[in-house]
């Protein structure tokens, strides 16, 4: 290794440290969460993304428009279509989110977002950052909330994944020091840990969840994971009515499939990378990632999405119209709840449970032997009408 190589790596590391320090200062200066009741109009952005994204997002927006028809007609809610968050536009701009698209996103209060394609090794695309990661950072969507519920198995879990720090914070900014040595970085701040922990404990208290589990690998990754664990535990001390326990990520993945132990879990707090992995595992219990929605919450903005990818193969094979919208519809339930429409959120959630697990009049297979995305949307709205009568 040459002195020039060391100097180059140090300069890049210094730039990363300064940028993350500035971000930490901005977190300290933030105000409180937005009060949707005080708004004259709530603007819901509808951003289709890539692959099957436009299909399932359009269908979910159609269901939302049906449920919110009275508020739309009264001028209290507006749907705004944002069409530019595609891999082609992002590559053309050489940015994870083109500037004009980001401005459109910032003009909304909440965003319903379809899956986007993230370039990886071997793809024809340049190495631009994940649009999801970029959006979470740009809009400071610090909490990723993913519920998993399977009543017959005693599963009622809610995952709070820290969204803007950890191993993903500077995921495209690692340093190739030499041909033989590459380094990536993990970011943990006091402010980031404190706010995700408070959100999780507040949720646990409001929803009568008696246990919060903090998931790390602090026995090995002692500095960043250790900081995350200690600060979350410190917040937990302010909630004596809630039991706090701590688990290592590896044993947690095992205990989720332990039929006796998994019933004890209620609310989880996890750093970014662990949360991404374990929530996909958890989603399998209720039918896979195609059935699971996700909320990304910040103090000013919120974004709601499916947790699966853009499925480009379905598009190439001409099967996009058969894509499963359930993940986006589950995300829509959380969107409704977030903007204060809890009654309509409960109504949509009940309709989805009937369509997916009870009545099951239509079956989604992703192919011609199943129903189309649009047909399933009609089925959900028909079910909403029936249970509203």
Label each residue range with its predicted role.
Residues 88-183, 273-275:
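N-terminal glycine-rich phosphate/adenylate-binding segment common to multiple enzyme folds
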